[in-house]
Amino acid sequence: LDYELTVLTVSSSAGIVTCAPIGQRQESGDYRESWQPATFTPDVLEQAQHIARTAVEGLVAKAQASGEKGWGVFGVELFVLTDGNVLFNEVSPRPHDTGMVTMASQRLSEFALHARAILGLPITQEHVALSIPEGTVAASHAIVVQGDGEAEFRNVAAALAEPGTDLRVFAKPEVHGHRRMAVALAVGGNEADARAKAGNVAESLDIAIV
């Protein structure tokens, strides 16, 4: 295994389209970072898009056979091997955690795409286009809080002082043990820059359990 990709695939009244592949880093099987567009060869892109489209076409056909529409966002996870071959891992019939980066990278986030699709609005390649300047990369960094109680976010202004950064705090009132409570977003000149900026936002926050 060389690396993993997520291809967000959208089924709507206009058919099936795919977003630019998303790179990701996991810890113990849980998402920690993602970035879009990921770096890959043209052959990997072709394989990834073909596998994602084929998987979703099959699921949509099954849904339609039972009288459903099969519309929405599907997160297709893929393994890229060191020899360049791409293998299917799994598919989530919903917006995907690694796809939170689309809140910074695309014209429409995965959440907006999902809402529009299930409402019957057509989704075309135009709607899934990247909105960041050409040559730049967007990144997300999960903020996982440990403790028992309510999480209070402090030092937010300082954490977001660097241009091209953002923070989305989830509407989760309490944490018991460990829980993903927010996500840091950033746009940078390349993958390393974007990931570092998002990571700096996460590390600069002072999160207290009250």
Residue ranges and their predicted role:
Residues 4-6, 18, 73-75, 88, ...:
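Broad gene-expression machinery/nucleic-acid interaction feature
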Residues 14-17, 26-28, 96, 148-149, ...:
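Short, acidic Gly/Pro/Ser/Thr-rich loop/turn segments
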Residues 116-210:
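Peripheral (often C-terminal) accessory segments that flank ATP-dependent C-N-forming ligase machineries
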Residues 47-76, 82, 92-149:
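Active-site "cap" helix and flanking loop/linker of ATP-utilizing ligase/carboxylase catalytic domains
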Residues 29-39, 90-103:
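Short, flexible active-site loops
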Residues 22, 82, 105, 185-188:
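Conserved residues at beta->alpha junctions
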Residues 1-83:
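Internal nucleotide-binding/catalytic subdomain
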Residues 81-87, 178-180:
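A short, glycine/Asx- and small/polar-enriched loop/turn
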